[in-house]
Each structure stands twice: as structure tokens, then as C-alpha cells.
């Protein structure tokens, strides 16, 4: 089953995601490619574990969904998302039996190491979400990345590396077959938590069932009689940096469209928060008392994050710069 970001709860649970098999082990695979690994690996268990697969390629998502469906693996959830925000916001503490990472992108160029998945912050996050006895399983053909991952695991202070042979299923992936045909070797490690740190979930929420719910970021304002939407130009704002989150958020207001259904406009905004990116619509609609409501729209299934709240604020601030009088801020 393919899930959108908005289909998850924050955090979620195996009981909700896998209502027919909640008691089974729960395994997450990062970068499942065309889905060859999981049918082979699941077959090594008496009963197929519950599976959560995360991938950033839409084409791979569709291929893997078909492969798992044909294999009869119904207790599998696939999603197109970066791994870190999914693990941090969706997965409860101490709930995973394993996190599988087969042939991750090694980002081999100088200066690109910061893009690698298996760095110390990821290992701390993984340790917080793994059950006692769980592990991160890495299989790779890239020797330097393998050594890098082992160093980062040690630097995390919460993981130790056990060097072992890869599970046979890891050698059935597309890349593993390619490297074996070329006579190249692969390396494998089990990164086992020595400590389970507390890594909190962020302030993330699902879009409420009703757009009128107070939890939907919004503002109420009065536009000037001379408001000119043609004055809009692409606009970028940044903020939200803290000691815990030095990156914060970036909001780019891309386009302002006239609404065909009601008196008002719709703003398209691009919101970036670390590895998580969303494109959201923010409505500017007329109210019966002559004021306008600025509000996040449900279209596209956004989740409500600090950056999305900030996007509503950035739109409100821009309208204020155009002469609007803000009566209420609900973000």
C-alpha cells in the first residue's frame, strides 16, 4: 500500500498501519529501489514482518508496490519521502526491529559527505526508534562509505558495529547483482544500539478533518481598497533557527493566482525544512464582513509543521506590506 505523507499519524503505530498483524516484527527499509530485497528477506521469517519502505524515486515506488503485491505481501507500507523525517516524526520510540539500508548513495565527491544518510545524528535517531536487540543493517560496495559509516556510528556514542556477512536477500538487489557480475565485493555491518537516547518528535500535525478547525494555520485581515495582486513577485523568507535546529525553515512564495470559485486568491508556497519539502496552497478568501481569511488549504495533503505555519505568516506579512490591516493571527 502506498501512503502519502498526510496518510500517516505523528507518531503512528504498528497497530494502525498493520491492523491484521500488529504483533509481528516491524522492519523499515531505506531506499528500497525496485523492491527486490523485501520478498527475499521476508521469506526467511516464519511470517512476513510488517514492512515500512521509504524511497525518494516515484518510479521505484510504483515498481516496488507492484512487486510486493505480486508476492502477496499485504502488510507492507511504501512511501515517497526522505528517511530522516519519516523516522523522526512517524515511527514511535522503541518500535522497530531493524532498519535496513542496502547500497545507499555514497555521495563520493569532496564536500558531499554532509548529504550521506549514515552520519552520527542518524545513528542517534535510529537508536531511539529501535527496540532492544534491534539493529541498523548496512550493505554496501563502497569501501570508503562503509568505513565512514562505522566511524560515524562510533562517534554517535550509541552504536557499535558488528561486521558480518550480508543476508543473502541483500545480494538479490539490482545493485548487488551488478557488482557481483563485475567481480566486486560488498561489505555488511550490523549497527547495534548500546544506548537508546530520547530523540523527541517534532511539532508536526495532520491536517484536521475540517478546514475550519482552529488548528489550521490562518489569519484574518482587511485588504486595502487599492490592493493590487499584480504587485506580487517571487519572495523568499527564512527563519526558525534554534540550537536544536540550526537550519530552520525556508519559505518561497512562488505564484499568486486568482480564484475562479470565490472572491479571492491562492498563493503557491514552497516550504523546506531540512530534508522535508512541501508545496502548499494558501487561500486568501473574502468573508461576509468584508475582511479576508488567509488559511492553509487542504489540497495536496499537507502536514502542519513549523515551516508551513511560517508560510501562512509570510503570506500575511506580505499582504500587510501591501497595506492590509491584520486583525488576528492564528499560526
UniProtKB/Swiss-Prot annotation:
Its job: Catalyzes the formation of N(7)-methylguanine at position 46 (m7G46) in tRNA.
Known catalytic reactions: guanosine(46) in tRNA + S-adenosyl-L-methionine = N(7)-methylguanosine(46) in tRNA + S-adenosyl-L-homocysteine
Xref: InterPro entries: SAM-dependent_MTases_sf (IPR029063), tRNA_(Gua-N-7)_MeTrfase_Trmb (IPR003358), tRNA_methyltr_TrmB_bact (IPR055361)
Entry keywords, A to Z: Methyltransferase, S-adenosyl-L-methionine, Transferase, tRNA processing
Designated name of the protein: tRNA (guanine-N(7)-)-methyltransferase
Annotated source species: Deinococcus geothermalis (strain DSM 11300 / CIP 105573 / AG-3a)
Gene3D superfamilies xref list: Vaccinia Virus protein VP39
Annotated EC: 2.1.1.33
Transmembrane segments: none
Pfam families per the UniProt record, alphabetical: Methyltransf_4
Functional pathway: tRNA modification; N(7)-methylguanine-tRNA biosynthesis
Family from the record: Belongs to the class I-like SAM-binding methyltransferase superfamily. TrmB family.
Binding site for substrate: 109, 141
GO cellular component, as recorded: tRNA methyltransferase complex
Binding site for S-adenosyl-L-methionine: 29, 55, 105
PROSITE patterns per the UniProt record, alphabetical: SAM_MT_TRMB (PS51625)
GO molecular function: tRNA (guanine(46)-N7)-methyltransferase activity
Annotated catalytic residues: 105
Amino acid at each position: 500500500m502506498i501512503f502519502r505523507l498526510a496518510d500517516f499519524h505523528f507518531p503512528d503505530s504498528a497497530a494502525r498501519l498493520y491492523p491484521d498483524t500488529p504483533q509481528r516484527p516491524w522492519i523499515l527499509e531505506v531506499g528500497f529501489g525496485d523492491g527486490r530485497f523485501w520478498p527475499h528477506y521476508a521469506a526467511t521469517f516464519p511470517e512476513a514482518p510488517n514492512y515500512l519502505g521509504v524511497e525518494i524515486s516515484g518510479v521505484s515506488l510504483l515498481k516496488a508496490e507492484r512487486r510486493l503485491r505480486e508476492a502477496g505481501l499485504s502488510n507492507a507500507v511504501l512511501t515517497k519521502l526522505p528517511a530522516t523525517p519519516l523516522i523522526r516524526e512517524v515511527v514511535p520510540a522503541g518500535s522497530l526491529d531493524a532498519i535496513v539500508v542496502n547500497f545507499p548513495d555514497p555521495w563520493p565527491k569532496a564536500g558531499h559527505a554532509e548529504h550521506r544518510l549514515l552520519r552520527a545524528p542518524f545513528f542517534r535517531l535510529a537508536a531511539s526508534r529501535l527496540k532492544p536487540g534491534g539493529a541498523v543493517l548496512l550493505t554496501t560496495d563502497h569501501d570508503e562509505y562503509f568505513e565512514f559509516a562505522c566511524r560515524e556510528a562510533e562517534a554517535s556514542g550509541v552504536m557499535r558495529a558488528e561486521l558480518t556477512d550480508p543476508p543473502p536477500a541483500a545480494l538479490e538487489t539490482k545493485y548487488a547483482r551488478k557488482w557481483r557480475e563485475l567481480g566486486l565485493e560488498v561489505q555488511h555491518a550490523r549497527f547495534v544500539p548500546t544506548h537508546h537516547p530520547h530523540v523527541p518528535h517534532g511539532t508536526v500535525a495532520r491536517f484536521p478533518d475540517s478546514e475550519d478547525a482552529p488548528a489550521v494555520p490562518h489569519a484574518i485581515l482587511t485588504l486595502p481598497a487599492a490592493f493590487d495582486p499584480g504587485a506580487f513577485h517571487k519572495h523568499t523568507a527564512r527563519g526558525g533557527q534554534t540550537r536544536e535546529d540550526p537550519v530552520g525553515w525556508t519559505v518561497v512564495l512562488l505564484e499568486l493566482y486568482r480564484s475562479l470559485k470565490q472572491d479571492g486568491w491562492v498563493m503557491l508556497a514552497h516550504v523546506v525544512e531540512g530534508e522535508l519539502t512541501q508545496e502548499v496552497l494558501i487561500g486568501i478568501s473574502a468573508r461576509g464582513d468584508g475582511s479576508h481569511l488567509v488559511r492553509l488549504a487542504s489540497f495536496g495533503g499537507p502536514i502542519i509543521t513549523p515551516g508551513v505555519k511560517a508560510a501562512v505568516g509570510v503570506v500575511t506579512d506580505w499582504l500587510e506590506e501591501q497595506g492590509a490591516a491584520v486583525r488576528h493571527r492564528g499560526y
